[in-house]
Amino acid sequence: FMRLRRLGVSAGHAWNGSWEAIAASSDDRPYEVKMREQLALIAGDQLLASAYGALLRNAVDDRLTIKDVTAKLSDADKTLVPDVEPTADALLERISALANGLERLQRDLPTDALTQLELRVASVQAEPEQAPDRERRLTLLTRQLSSLQELVSRREMMQRQLDSASMALRSLRLDIVKLRTMGVGAAISDVTNATQEARALSKDLGYVISAADEMRKL
C-alpha cells in the first residue's frame, strides 16, 4: 500500500478499484523498466530467447501503449471504453500461454521429425512380408506417426491462435491510439468493435488452453 501512496493513490481509491488507473497515469518510470517488468511476469529467459521472444516483446509493447493511453483519458471517456483494459490483459495472458506451449513443442518436436518418421514407416512397408519382426515394427511406427501427426496439427492450430491473438491486441492498440488522436466521438465505434472481437477471441482461446491443460493432467 505504501507504494501506491507514493503514486498518489488514496485508501479510498485503493478500495473502490480506481487505483490502477491512477497508478498507471502516475508511473513515470522509463519505458524500458516497465517493459522488463512486464516481460518478467509473462515469460522466462528461455522463452524470450526463443523464436517467440520478438512476438512477446511486441505484445507487451502493445499492452503498455494501451495502458498509457487509457490512463490519460478523462473519466468520462473511460466510461465509454470500460472493457479495453481487461480485454488487453486477457489477450496478453493468452499470447503468453500459447507462446509457452509452442516453445515447448518446438523443443520436443524437431522440425524434420514428421518427415523422418514417415520415411521410416515407408522403409518398413517396403520390406518383404516375411522380414523378421516386420509387423511389430510397422505397428509401432504407425502408432508413433499417428501421435506425431496429432502433435504437429496441434502446433499448427496453436500458431494460428497465437497469430490471431497478437493481431487482435495490435488492432486494439491502434484503435485506442486513434481514439486519443481523433477524439472519442470519431473512434469510439472502432474501439468498441475491436474490443468485442478481441474479448470473444480471448474467451475462445481461454477454453482451448484450459482444455489442453486438462488433457496434460490425464
Where are the language model's segments positioned?
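Long amphipathic all-alpha helical oligomerization modules
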Residues: 125-218
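Membrane-proximal, non-transmembrane interface segments of integral membrane proteins
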Residues: 2-128
